C-alpha cells in the first residue's frame, strides 16, 4: 500500500482490482463523494496498483517496487495530479509561478503524511485551461507501453475555459 493511514473502501477496491485482474479497465473512473472520504487517496492508490510491478494478492500495490516508490513520493512520470491553481500570469504560458510550485510541493508533502489532506493552493477557485493544455502535451509525448497513464483531476467541476 502507498498510504498506510488510508482506510480502504473494500467494496470499491474489490471492483477496481477485479477490473484490473480481468483486463477490463475502462478508460475513466469517477471517484465522487463528500470531502474527507479519501477519494483522491483511493485514486492515487489505484494508480499505484495499475503500475505496480509486484502486486500483492492480486489486489494491492506492493509499495516497494520502483513504480510504487515513485507514486509514494507523488513523482511518477505517468501519474498526473490536476487541481485548482492560480492561472499563469501569461495566458499563453502554462508554467506556474515559483511560489505556487512551492505551495504545491508543500501540499504534496502533507498529502503523503495524511491521505485525507485536501490539496489547496492559495485561494484558487478554478483549474485553468493552461493546465489541461500542458497535460495534453505531456500525455501525447510521454506514452509508455509498460505503464498506465493516469490523470487524477481533483475538483473537476472547477475546470474552466480561460
Where are each of the predicted segments found?
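Clamp-loader machinery-focused feature within the broader ASCE/P-loop NTPase space
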Residues: 2-159
